[in-house]
Structure formats: structure tokens, C-alpha cells
Amino acid sequence: MKVIFIQSSVAASTQLSKIRLSLLSLIVMTGLAANTANAALASQVLPVKYHAGQYCPSDMKAFVPKGTAHKNFVADISCMRQQLQAYQAEHQPINTRFQAYKADAWLSYVAHERNEASLTKASRYALAEALSIVEALKTNQVDKLPLTADIPPTSGLQRPDLWASLLTIKQTPAFAPLVKTVADSEVKLIWAEAEFCEFGWRHSREHYNTVDRWVATAELTALNTSGVDKQSFNALKTQYLARLKPLAATKNSKESCRGAVLPYIELPKVGMAEPSPQTLTLPVVPVASSH
């Protein structure tokens, strides 16, 4: 009599991944209903003032385009962005990388203004957020910063669908490789909302179109990432969307241009290394020999 050993390690691994994400989704969904913590803004958690000419060490060369009128301000922004690169490195913790990329995105926002005196109210919030994150990174206080900061009062919640996607991605293993895209998308979305609140849809449309593309690509990547179950992802996204929709304005309305408190999020456990699933061996099945 011959004996055939049947193993199903691949199927077991896939099933365990689904179970892990499903359990996480259940925990997060429960937290959405029970946790009312305010995510706050980085600049509220760690307020920092701007000090002109204090951000370029002697060994760093700022990039200042020819013809720049207010060179000191532009140089400060350039030097801060250079300093953030060390915190964006792959070996850094995921929250450190995320905050560093977000600070860089805020500074990119601010860089569109010619000098500190010309900053709009929205740009001042952007600068304040960047300064606080930079300070937190330099002083090892990054864990004090919210993983998802609130929408500042110069903006409003116009696209709950995009925010729901970004919040959901943060709860999956895809957050690690998508950390820059998520950071850039959050700031760009707030930027678009600020443009809408100040100038209307005509001025904000280009920003929204950009975020639409970024988030759509990020979500597709997340759904194709190992360990992400599509059903659990969509269920969690639906929960976030239900939470956010009441905070959003009606179409073409500026009634929500007063900021918004977004759902509180902890750093996702699934973004960390997990032990490899054990191989499951099925019972030995005796098969009669043909001889």
C-alpha cells in the first residue's frame, strides 16, 4: 500500500491573513463607535514658532532659485525639506517616515508663497504643521503626533470618500509601502479643500483631480498587497465613510469650511512584522496500490 501526504500551507497562509485583517477590522470598527478622542493638529500637540534664518546649518546649502526676492524664507523652507530626508529613509519606523513625508508636503504647500508676510491663513496652518513635525522628529517626540491630524479650520470636509480610503489604507499592511502617497494625498486634499473654501470649485478642481488619481492608485495597490482581504478592506472603508459623511458639506456648499475632527487612529499593528504561519498538515490518507 502506498501513502500520499497532502499539505496545504499556501491555503492556510492565505486564510490566516484574512483572519488577521478581519479581526483588526472588527477592532477598528468597534473603536470608531466607542473612541471619541480628538486627533488634533500637530501644531496643537507641539506648538512651534517660526524663527527666520534659523534652519540652515553651516554645512547645508539651500536651494534658492535665481531672482528670488525673499531669499531667507525660501532658504529656510529648502533646508527644512533637506533635513527631513534622513527621517524618510526605509530603515526608519513607519510613523517617523509618514510624519516626515507629511511635513515635506506641508512645506511644499508653503513654498508656493513668496515670503512669510504673504502667507494666507491656510498657508500659516501649513507652516505651523510642518514646524511642529520637524521639531517632533528632531526631539524624538514623533509618537506624540496624531497619525491622522484633523482638518484645519481654513478647510472643510468635501470628499469623505477620499478620506475614508486613506484612513482604511492606514489599517493595512499596504500602509508601509504607500506611506509617502498617503501623506502627500492628505495634505493635497486639505490644500484642495482650502482652495475651495477661499475661491470655489474652479480653483480647487485641479487639486481634487490630482488627489483622485493618487488615492485610486493607492487603493488599488492596497487591495493587491499580500495580507489584505478585499471584503474586510471595503467593510472598514464603509464604516469610515458612514462616520465622515455627516461632517461633509452638501455639493458646492461652503458650510463645512470650518475644519473637521477626523476619526482617531492608532498605528496599525498589521504594518509590523508578523510571524510566518505554520504549515498545516492534513491527516495521512491511505491509498490502495494498483499492484
PLM features per residue range, with description:
Residues 13-14, 35-36, 290:
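Short stretches within intrinsically disordered, low-complexity N-terminal or propeptide regions
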Residues 29-38:
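C-terminal segment of classical bacterial N-terminal signal peptides
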Residues 4-24:
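Bacterial N-terminal signal peptides that target proteins for export
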Residues 16-19, 23, 32, 233, ...:
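Extended hydrophobic/Leu-rich segments
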Residues 38-291:
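Long, charged/polar, soluble alpha-helical segments
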